[in-house]
Amino acid sequence: RRYDGARPLGAIKSTILALLYLVIAALFAAIGGMYIASLLGNTKFFMEFALFRGVKLTFVLPIILVIIAYLQRFPLWNGRMINSKEEAKTFVVEFLTMDVKLYVFFIIAALGGAVWVFVGRSGHTAGVPVPGFELMLRRFLENTMYARPREKEFIIGHPALMLATFAFMRKWPTVIHFLLTLAGVIGIASMVETFCHLRTPVFMSIMRGYDGLLIGALFGVLLIIAVRFMMYVTQWFQAREVDHE
């Protein structure tokens, strides 16, 4: 959908649409995940004569595609969209030759650390170690729910995707729902990644995604309510300051 300047939707309608779009995205993720699972249902993968090396790609590629889609549909770069080869070449040249402040390196380092953690903890091989408090949370979820949902889905991805949709419907600045969408893609990519575990039954992967979607949707609604409350409080204090002046 192209960027437009239409009036923002109401808060309740925006929240309902945020929940609806999260469910739709989760359904697409489940379809893609089951397709991958069907491809892996082969003796050579179970006997480990062949290894599936696309686990980390299922996590990284959606983020790259979202960045490209945003650059094509929203005026993110210098107030313009990038829809042709010439515009893409101009973007690359401008991006590589732009002035960079020192604080940008700290931001890049922080983002690089986050990417290292998320990508390193995906896949079948040992990567970034899991902290103790998260192991306790996992144990609690395993004992409480039918299938333990993934933390990056219901804590980060799904709530962020709902807030991104809410931000878009409410006509917040584009950069806000862009960053939130990048965070939201983590949850959707994680759902696809769940089906890449060879020895996990498909039904368990479906239930794991469903449990994560259920809790993530609840957290997303609570996050939207919390953000709305903070905005009302901020506006109230600003109005009081204006009255005192």
Model regions: which residues?
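Alpha-helical transmembrane segments of integral membrane proteins
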Residues: 1-245
